[in-house]
């Protein structure tokens, strides 16, 4: 539901995945701030990243929940990956899209994992 300020309320994983895919096509830069990254073999959400020029990932590794394959995939794709020290519980779920035309922010409870999408 869109209001006058451009805020959209997303109430399901399906809506979140659809909006994430749309924004990956509309914008050219994405900053991901997430507690965990999943296995790239699950395709979603990794397939959407192909539409972007640049991707920065700020990733938590607490509780050994991030997939080593997912981390390696991001590194192999030459995305900027910053792993946050696991001495602290790093638990954001923010997706910040930017381009010359504007910006958008998705936030909520979805980690960058198949289950989150």
Question: At which residue positions do the language-model features occur?
Answer:
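PLD/PLD-like phosphodiesterase catalytic module centered on the HKD motif
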Residues: 1-117
């Amino acid at each position: 539901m869109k209001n006058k300020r451009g805020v959209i309320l997303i109430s399901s994983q399906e809506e979140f995945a659809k909006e994430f895919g749309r924004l990956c096509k509309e914008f050219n830069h994405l900053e991901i701030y997430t507690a965990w990254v999943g296995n790239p073999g699950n395709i979603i959400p990794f397939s959407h990243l192909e539409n972007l020029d640049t991707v920065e990932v700020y990733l938590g590794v607490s509780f050994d929940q991030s997939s080593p394959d997912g981390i390696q995939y991001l590194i192999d794709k030459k995305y900027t990956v910053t792993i946050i020290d696991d001495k602290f519980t790093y638990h954001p779920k923010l997706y910040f899209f930017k381009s010359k035309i504007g910006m958008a922010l998705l936030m909520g409870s979805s980690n960058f994992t198949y289950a989150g999408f």
